[in-house]
């Protein structure tokens, strides 16, 4: 079914109303080939299926005139046209699947040439796309239409179409290849599922801006990846990209917003915003009750002069496991291309707010990084949660391997735990190298045998980020680490911990500031109680070989305990360096406990001791009382002044030293006259008569038995004999 025009004007509107519509290798479409507009398409049905390469399309192609006539002979007016809108309402299921040779099933509005593409709007109970099926709007030199999907039930995208050695994913996307802006994608669904390489994306490859993506659902699931050409994995993903080989292109990435009760990203799936040009990448905003990433990735990245976008997550619980990654960074596209532009944009800020739990496990990481051979600044990491757990080799890292500075790590929590070997909070700067490409060519080509490597390589200095933690309780144990470090001639940042209650380092837990050749960083800790156990350590260490000013360690605490081989140390190769350890009282109270095998030492490498400044608290004088004057030396004499008085039924001796009286073991205190209620006599009332106990005895099992017979009863229990009492015999 087709409406088209080869001339100017409007091709006409196409409207289809039916109970069930099924297309198999068939099309419904409108098109125009010169200036004008292809008509709108409206479809209303109970169910709609597009099978085996079938399509619904509205298309305009003005560029076809260039193939027929010489470019200069085609007036600009004839180069302009727009495609129509597509509106689909399906009461039950809309399904796109199957291919026909190299054609996949699709719904599209597109313009080839100059002009704007139309919008696509779909309402259905269920939507299913598979086998490389697509919903698409695109334009070359015009604005791209929007895609709006409103699905009351499940919406699924699965798999890909394989043509030759390439795989084309099932997708929903808007794309601009020219100066126009890309359209937005808006999705409302009960449950959105993307699997096996399926994709939702907006992209610009020129000066136009990429569109935004907004998803509202009860549950969002992204799972799996495919191998393109059997070599490179292509993840299941939701992404907005600024992608071009022309670095001067200024198109901006769109915002990616997800709002759902539960979001799961697993088995290589991704949520991303990327830029390869001067335009900034889009940002990612996620609001959910529960976010779980299992070997999944959430990423904003810049590979060009543009800046990476921010990542902002608001949730009750956030769990990253099995190598999952949350990252924002700056990377040089080809670090081995020495003649490339190293002016790479800044990394984005990562913000995670988890009102209940933020957990990283099994090698997962939150990472803000700048790669080698770049001149860029790292983004900051801000984490805010009630409980934060970093374990199983997981890490929160801000790093810079280029020329700029690393970002800071700010963490706020009521309860923070860093558990396990390689689990860490880390801010590091390693600097980089600047290479003169001309001299490098001479060196590796052998044309200049006298070339000196130092003449073409310039070491660069970077500055590490600061780690700032504000928590009620902090525990670092089982090899866990909080660390700022630097390599090359770079300098590390500082560690600043504000702990309201207690700081625990246990079983090789470590807080460190270290440098290879530069100055050391400082460690500043305010905590009411600090305890180091089982070979745990606080360390500020500068260069082991060069004269440097080492970092200081400053502790403000009420109680400091070093036990079982733990250490607080600084070291410096410079006799005039820092290497200070300062311990201050918390609110005028300070207690320092140190086991014999533990160490507080501020000695440099030349064994020149630094300053250990322990400020004594201003304590009031205490009167010491002689304990012998207030403790009794004769407990028996003291006991004679106390005894029990018999005022009830008996059963207790007069005092702890005496025995029970012989006869008075029970007294009946009940009134002698008890009213008897009137009742109807039954046969059971006449069968037996209660007899008052006349005595009692102890049976062989040690139980006391009340008995109506007294002939064989023992008159009394065996009575204990009173013990003698003396100061030397007080144990009963």
Q: What does each model-identified segment do?
A:
Residues 1-732:
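Extracellular and secretory-pathway beta-repeat/beta-biased strand scaffolds
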């Amino acid at each position: 079914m087709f409406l088209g025009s080869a001339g100017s004007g409007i091709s006409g509107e196409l409207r289809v109303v039916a109970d069930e519509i099924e297309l198999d290798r068939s099309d419904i479409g409108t098109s125009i080939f010169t200036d004008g507009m292809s008509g709108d398409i409206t479809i209303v049905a109970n169910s709609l299926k597009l099978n085996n390469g079938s399509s619904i399309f509205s298309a305009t192609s003005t560029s076809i005139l260039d193939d027929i006539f010489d470019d200069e002979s085609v007036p600009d007016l004839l180069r302009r046209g727009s495609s129509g809108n597509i509106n689909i309402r399906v009461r039950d299921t809309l399904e796109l699947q199957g291919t026909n040779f190299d054609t996949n099933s699709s719904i599209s509005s597109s313009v080839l040439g100059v002009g704007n593409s139309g919008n696509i709007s779909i309402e259905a109970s269920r939507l299913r796309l598979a086998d490389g099926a697509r919903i698409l709007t695109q334009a070359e030199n015009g604005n791209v239409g929007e895609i709006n999907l409103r699905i009351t039930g499940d919406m699924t995208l699965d798999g890909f179409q394989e043509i030759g050695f390439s795989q084309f994913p099932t997708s929903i996307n808007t794309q601009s290849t020219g100066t126009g802006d890309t359209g937005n994608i808006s999705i409302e669904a009960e449950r959105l599922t993307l699997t096996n390489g399926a994709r939702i994306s907006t992209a610009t490859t020129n000066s136009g801006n990429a569109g935004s993506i907004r998803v509202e659902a009860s549950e969002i699931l992204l799972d799996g990846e495919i191998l393109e050409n059997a070599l490179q994995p292509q993840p299941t993903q939701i992404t907005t990209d600024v992608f071009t080989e022309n670095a001067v292109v200024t198109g901006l990435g769109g915002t990616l917003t997800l709002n759902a009760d539960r979001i799961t990203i697993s088995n290589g799936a991704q949520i991303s915003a990327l830029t390869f040009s001067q335009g900034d990448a889009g940002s990612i905003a996620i609001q959910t009750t529960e976010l779980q990433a299992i070997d999944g990735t959430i990423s904003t990245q810049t590979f060009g002069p543009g800046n990476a976008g921010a990542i902002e997550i608001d949730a009750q619980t956030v769990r990253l496991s099995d190598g999952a990654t949350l990252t924002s960074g700056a990377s040089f596209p080809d670090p081995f291309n020495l003649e490339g532009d190293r002016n790479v944009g800044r990394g984005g800020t990562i913000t995670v707010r988890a009102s209940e739990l933020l957990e990283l496990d099994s090698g997962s990481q939150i990472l803000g990084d700048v790669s080698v051979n770049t001149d860029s600044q790292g983004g900051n990491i801000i984490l805010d949660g009630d409980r934060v757990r970093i374990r199983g080799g997981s890490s929160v890292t801000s790093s810079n391997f280029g020329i700029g500075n690393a970002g800071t790590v700010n963490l706020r929590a009521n309860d923070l735990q860093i558990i396990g070997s390689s689990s860490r909070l880390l801010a590091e700067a390693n600097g980089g190298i600047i290479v003169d490409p001309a001299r490098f060519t001479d060196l590796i080509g052998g044309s200049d045998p006298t070339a000196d490597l130092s003449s073409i390589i310039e070491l660069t200095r970077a500055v590490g980020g600061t780690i700032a933690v504000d928590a009620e309780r902090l525990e670092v144990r089982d090899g866990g680490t909080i660390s700022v470090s630097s390599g090359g001639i770079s300098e590390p940042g500082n560690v600043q911990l504000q702990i309201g209650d207690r700081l625990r380092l246990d079983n090789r837990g470590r807080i460190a500031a270290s440098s290879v050749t530069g100055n050391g960083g400082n460690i500043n800790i305010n905590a009411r109680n600090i305890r180091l156990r089982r070979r745990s350590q606080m360390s500020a260490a500068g260069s082991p070989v060069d004269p440097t000013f080492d970092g200081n360690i400053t502790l403000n605490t009420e109680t400091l305990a070093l036990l079982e081989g733990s250490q607080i140390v600084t070291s410096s190769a410079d006799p005039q360096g820092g290497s200070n350890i300062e311990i201050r009282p918390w609110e005028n109270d300070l207690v320092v406990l140190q086991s014999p095998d533990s160490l507080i030492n501020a000695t440099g490498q030349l064994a020149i001791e630094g300053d250990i400044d322990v400020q004594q608290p201003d304590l009031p004088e205490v009167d010491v009382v002689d304990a012998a004057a207030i403790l009794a030396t004769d407990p028996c004499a003291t006991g004679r002044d106390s005894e029990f008085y018999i005022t009830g039924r008996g059963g207790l001796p007069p005092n702890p030293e005496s025995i029970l009286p012989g006869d008075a073991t029970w007294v009946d205190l009940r009134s002698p006259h008890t009213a008897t209620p009137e009742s109807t006599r039954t046969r059971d009332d006449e069968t037996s008569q209660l007899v008052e106990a006349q005595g009692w005895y102890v049976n062989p099992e040690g139980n006391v038995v009340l008995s109506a017979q007294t002939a064989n009863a023992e008159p009394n229990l065996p009575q204990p004999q009173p013990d003698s009492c003396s100061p030397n015999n007080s144990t009963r």
